[in-house]
């Protein structure tokens, strides 16, 4: 499946204003349709410092019993324990635009560290 990371400044307003604020405190993957494009959003939840990262590594569709499940493989990076980071609450998020034509029936997040 093809996808591309979307720079935060180029995200549709629906994603930045509605979806990310609602889900940023959770650790999950979700998909949404905006202007006929399907986006996948991976959130890491609330973190106590800067330095936490999330990125989408790959995605596949699994079909079972007439249901399509989007499996999202995400890389989570934690800050180096030997490095000082800002003591500020952060919400790591990664948004990618996919080549999907419709929303999947379900989404499963598989995390890799």
Residues of each region from the PLM?
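Exposed, flexible binding/inhibitory loops of compact, secreted disulfide-stabilized domains
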Residues: 1-113
């Amino acid at each position: 499946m093809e996808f591309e990371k979307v720079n935060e400044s180029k995200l549709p307003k629906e994603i930045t204003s509605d979806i990310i604020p609602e889900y940023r405190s959770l650790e999950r993957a979700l998909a949404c349709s905006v202007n006929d494009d399907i986006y996948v959003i991976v959130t890491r939840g609330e973190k106590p410092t800067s330095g936490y990262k999330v990125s989408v590594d790959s995605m596949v569709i699994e079909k079972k019993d007439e249901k399509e499940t989007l499996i999202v493989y995400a890389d989570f990076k934690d800050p180096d324990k030997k490095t000082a980071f800002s003591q500020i609450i952060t919400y790591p998020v990664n948004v990618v635009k996919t080549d999907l034509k419709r929303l999947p029936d379900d989404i499963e997040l598989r995390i890799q560290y």
